Every structure is written in C-alpha cells, then in structure tokens.
C-alpha cells in the first residue's frame, strides 16, 4: 500500500507512475477528494469534542451551583449524536479510501524500462550457450513419460488438468532439487530455512498483496476461510506481520520450500503440456527484510543467489528487467531469470526476484528499530524464486537428454540423487 502523503505531496508523480502500468490515474484524484473530506470531518469532530468537554464543565458547574442545567444537558445530547454521526461518516470514508488504496500497485522504480508486455522486457545478462544437439531433442513431457518419471493422465483422472504424478526417479529428482537448493541457500548464501504453513488467512494474503485484487487467482477453503498459498513468499513475508523487528536483526533472510497453488485464471491455452504451468507445483523461495537504504543492493545479491543455482546446474539462462507493463502488483523492480528450454527453442521464466520497498510492509505493518531509542520505521521486503522446482526439473530433462533416451544428472545433483549419474527407463 502507498503512503497517503505521496498523494498529498506528489500527486503528479503518483499519477505518472500509475499510468506507466496502464492503470487509470484518476484514482489519485478520488483519493485526494476523499482525503480532503476526511480531514474536514476530523476537524469538525475535534471541534465538537472540544465543545462537548466545555459543556460537560458547564453542566458540572451549574449542578454545583444548584442551577438549572436542562439547556446544556440538551446541548450535550445533541453534540453526542452529532459526534456519532461524524464518526460514522469518517469510518465510511476510511473504508472507501482503504478499498481504493489497497488496489493501487506499488510505484515503479525510475530505472524500470517502459513497455506494455513481456515483449518489452529488457535483457541485461546472458549466461551459457544453448546446447547444439546431434539428434532431434524431445520435449520434457515426452521424456518423463518414456522414462516413467511422471504420469499426467492419471493425475488428470484424480484431480483434473494441470496436475501431475511424479514417479520413480522423477519423484527422486524433484526431491533432490529441493534439497540441493535449500542446502545451497542456507550453507552458502546465509538464509535461514523455514517450513511454512500452506494454508493462510485473508489478512496474510492482504499483507503481501494477493487480496483483494487477485482473489480469482487463488484457491480458497470456503468453510475455514483459508487460502492455499500461491508461493511461500506469502507466509515468509507475513512472519513479521504486526511486529516491530528489534535492533540488530536486519538484514533477515529466509528460505523455504513449499507447494504452490494457482488457479491460472486467464491462462487457458498457454503451456498446456508438461510441467511449465500447473495448478500445483513446488518452489523454493527467498524472502528478505532490509533497512530501506540496503534494499537495492539486496535485490542484486538475491538475484545472483538464484543465478548461482542455474550456473552450478549448467543451465543456460538470461536475466531480464520486467517492463512497466509486465511487473507485478507489489514490486517496484523485478528481475526475471529465464532458462533455456529446447522444446520451446526459447527462454522461459524460472525465477522472479523483486524489491517491494515498503509496499508490503505498510500493508502488513512490518516495522523495525535501528536502536532501542529509535522510532519504528517500515522495513523493505524482497522476494525471489530460488528456484521454481518443476521448471528446473523440465530444464534439466531437456538440456541433459541423450540420444539413447537417457538423461544425465548434473554433477551438482549427484550427491542428492544417492550417487546416481543417469536416469534410464526402468526395467519394469
């Protein structure tokens, strides 16, 4: 959520930033009009309360002097009714303002390129060279079924489209990837490992910006009023919701693996085969809490943490800056890492790393103190995929496939695969 003072002090800047995202800047005028009404109501209410205090003193004085106080008692009742009415009006305006403010996205950093879609994202780095095959490479969805690593048909029978059973060495590879990523982040990158709740309440979803605007993208357990998480970013960021982080704690770095659940509303017909776009998938997440002056350097570091996984696995990738028309709701700046997939003959997103500045912290009331005597300030929050496990799985299967139908296991994963160096079709 944005600071109301930005609307008051820099309305033109806020309008231009909102317009860059393709949203209607008139919302700024709506907020300012409501803010003016609110301030007038507060002023009028304060005057009434001051008058009520004075009338209360007059009543007490008249009673002490045994004088008739009916007129001032009547005024007191009228003032009480008027104050209740003003408070009700103020509450209504506050709700309207909050309802609008919570749907306005974060302000985009000045160095984010302008554009309308992912076609306008800007490549800033490329690592590795896509492999030239001496044979016709297969898509991962064909490879995993031939090697009995996955079963899409039975998953469709049990759950519907966009689900998968990972079987045999497919399940082992998925587990190995998660263990490898978590181990890398905790032992080399300085993150604290967390196991997170995968059902969360509405306040939690509000804190990170999924609610109220993106409810259609979520799965909800209606009876309990809980939501399945779309990413571990949600519970990890809300760890400090409504708390003041004590001096000396920041920077705080969390990592955690979870299942992620997404309805994929609006993605009908896109990536309908394989592991790229599922309703349920595994992901290792990184979340950081930083002092404001440190968050931009933290974004660079967190992105290199994700890149280190791809490089150690030997997977060609590129880094792009998301343009103004493609960046997420809560982010001020986002880097996407895209891995090379031979089946697409293109790069596909495998990680998003974002600086959300104080946007989520204001929604979730996450503050910190620089020292014991200091006034609490809003922290900056960052999040990044480290990495999307299913897409990493797909990238390994496609990039490490062999002409005889086997898949070579990247060297970094061999210890996590029980020493296994190759995946072959099971005998049975």
UniProtKB/Swiss-Prot annotation:
Pathway: Aminoacyl-tRNA biosynthesis; selenocysteinyl-tRNA(Sec) biosynthesis; L-seryl-tRNA(Sec) from L-serine and tRNA(Sec): step 1/1
Coiled coil: none
Pfam family name, one: tRNA-synt_2b
Gene Ontology cellular component list: cytoplasm
Locations listed in the record: Cytoplasm
Domain notes: Consists of two distinct domains, a catalytic core and a N-terminal extension that is involved in tRNA binding.
Protein's job: Catalyzes the attachment of serine to tRNA(Ser). Is also probably able to aminoacylate tRNA(Sec) with serine, to form the misacylated tRNA L-seryl-tRNA(Sec), which will be further converted into selenocysteinyl-tRNA(Sec).
PANTHER family: SERINE--TRNA LIGASE (PTHR43697:SF1), SERYL-TRNA SYNTHETASE (PTHR43697)
Protein name, entry field: Serine--tRNA ligase
Organism: Staphylococcus aureus (strain NCTC 8325 / PS 47)
Name of the coding gene: serS
């Amino acid at each position: 959520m944005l600071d109301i003072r930005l609307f008051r002090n820099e309305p033109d800047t806020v309008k231009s930033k909102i317009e860059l995202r393709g949203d209607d800047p008139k919302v700024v005028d709506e907020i300012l009009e409501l803010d003016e009404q609110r301030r007038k109501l507060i002023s009028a209410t304060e005057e009434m309360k001051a008058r009520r205090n004075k009338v209360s003193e007059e009543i007490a004085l008249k009673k002490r002097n045994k004088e008739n106080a009916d007129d001032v008692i009547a005024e007191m009742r009228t003032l009480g009714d008027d104050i209740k009415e003003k408070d009700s009006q103020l509450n209504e305006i506050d709700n309207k303002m909050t309802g609008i403010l919570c749907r306005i996205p974060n302000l985009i950093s000045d160095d984010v390129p302008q554009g309308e879609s992912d076609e306008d994202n800007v490549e800033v780095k490329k690592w590795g060279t896509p492999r030239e095959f001496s044979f016709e490479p297969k898509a991962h969805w064909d490879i995993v079924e031939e090697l009995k690593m996955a079963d899409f048909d039975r998953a469709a029978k049990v759950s519907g489209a966009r689900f998968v059973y990972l079987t045999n060495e497919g399940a082992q590879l998925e587990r190995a990837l998660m263990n490898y990523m978590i181990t890398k982040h905790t032992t080399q990158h300085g993150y604290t490992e967390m196991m997170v709740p995968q059902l969360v309440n509405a306040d939690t979803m509000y804190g990170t910006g999924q609610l109220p605007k993106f409810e259609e993208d979520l799965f909800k357990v209606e009876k309990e009023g809980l939501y399945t998480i779309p990413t571990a970013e949600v519970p990890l960021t809300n760890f400090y919701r409504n708390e003041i982080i004590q001096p000396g704690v920041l920077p705080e770095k969390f990592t955690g693996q979870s299942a992620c659940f997404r309805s994929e509303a609006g993605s009908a017909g896109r990536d309908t085969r394989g592991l790229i776009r599922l309703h349920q998938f595994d992901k290792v997440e990184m979340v950081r809490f930083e002092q404001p002056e440190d968050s931009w350097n933290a974004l660079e570091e967190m992105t290199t943490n994700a890149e280190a996984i791809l490089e150690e696995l030997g997977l060609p990738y590129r880094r792009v800056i998301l343009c103004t028309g493609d960046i997420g709701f809560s982010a001020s700046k986002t880097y996407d890492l895209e891995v090379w997939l031979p089946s697409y003959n293109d790069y596909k997103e495998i990680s998003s790393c974002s600086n959300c500045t104080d946007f989520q912290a204001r929604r979730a009331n996450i503050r910190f103190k620089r020292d014991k005597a200091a006034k609490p300030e809003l922290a900056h929050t960052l999040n990044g995929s480290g990495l999307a496990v299913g897409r990493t799985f797909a990238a390994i299967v496609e990039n490490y496939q062999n002409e005889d139908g086997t898949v070579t296991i990247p060297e970094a994963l061999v210890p996590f695969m029980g020493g296994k160096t190759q995946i072959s079709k099971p005998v049975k």
